Structures are given as structure tokens and as C-alpha cells.
A protein has these predicted regions:
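Rossmann-like adenosine-cofactor binding region
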Residues: 19-90
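Generic secondary-structure transition motif, activating predominantly at the C-termini of alpha-helices
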Residues: 14, 45, 122-126
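Short, charged, surface-exposed secondary-structure boundary motifs
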Residues: 7-11, 52, 100-103
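Short, hinge-like loop/turn segments at secondary-structure boundaries
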Residues: 14-18, 43, 108-110
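NAD(P)-binding Rossmann-fold cofactor-contacting core
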Residues: 1-18
Length: 126
């Protein structure tokens, strides 16, 4: 998605959340931040090449939820790094992939499939 559309969508999301609870930042702004965050989402392609995204450790709180949109047969480098920093709630993008497919299936058929066995089957075949 081109940057202008992403910026518009970020603004729309921000309008739904009280301003003192929401900060949307680009990677180039993260080193200026003097706080940690409750939710960190890696949507870069860094995990596809086994690299860490350029996110400073100082913004990753052990109580945060850390999400990587990539997925693999084991936790991505980013998720492993977050776990080493003490983060207990780490998730990859496999559930989102299956959830989006299930939602599409529901829109076409009116039937909402159980995603848990699908995620389990896919995870075991990675």
C-alpha cells in the first residue's frame, strides 16, 4: 500500500482511540521516543531475510504484546529477540493469514469455519 494511503488509514485508526493512548510512528522516529509501548507490530520485511527490524530495545516493555506479521516454522528473529527481552506475549502472522481466509470464506458462503485446527495443521507443516 502506498505511503499516503497508509498515513490516511493510521489517522482513521487514531481517531478511534483516545489520543493519549495512541502513537503511530515511522521507523525513523523510534530513536527519539522516551517510552515503551504496549503493542509493537513488525510489518517490515526484515523477518523474511532473518534480520531484526531497526527497533530500539528501549521501546519494548516486557509487558508488551509483540506481533510479527511474518511467520515461519519457529519464532522469527524479531519474536526471539522480544522473548530474550522478557516479552511473554509474542505472536506471528499465521493466525492473521488464516483469519483473513476464514473471513473471506464466511463472506462467500455464510459459514464461519473453526480456524484453530487449520492453524494447527499449517503450523505443523511449516
Amino acid at each position: 500500500m502506498p505511503y499516503p494511503e497508509r498515513k490516511i488509514m493510521t489517522g482513521q485508526l487514531a481517531s478511534l482511540i483516545p489520543q493519549d493512548n495512541f502513537i503511530g510512528l515511522g521507523l525513523n522516529q523510534l530513536n527519539e521516543v522516551q517510552q515503551s509501548f504496549d503493542l509493537i507490530i513488525n510489518s517490515t520485511s526484515a523477518s523474511l531475510t532473518g534480520d531484526l527490524p531497526p527497533i530500539p530495545d528501549s521501546i519494548i516493555s516486557s509487558s508488551a504484546c509483540v506481533y510479527d506479521m511474518s511467520y515461519a516454522d519457529k519464532p522469527t528473529v524479531f519474536l526471539q529477540h522480544a522473548q530474550k527481552l522478557g516479552v511473554l506475549n509474542t505472536f506471528d502472522g499465521l493466525g492473521m493469514l488464516v483469519g483473513q481466509a476464514a473471513e473471506s470464506f464466511y463472506l462467500w458462503t455464510g459459514y464461519r469455519p473453526n480456524v484453530a485446527p487449520v492453524i494447527h495443521t499449517l503450523r505443523s507443516s511449516l
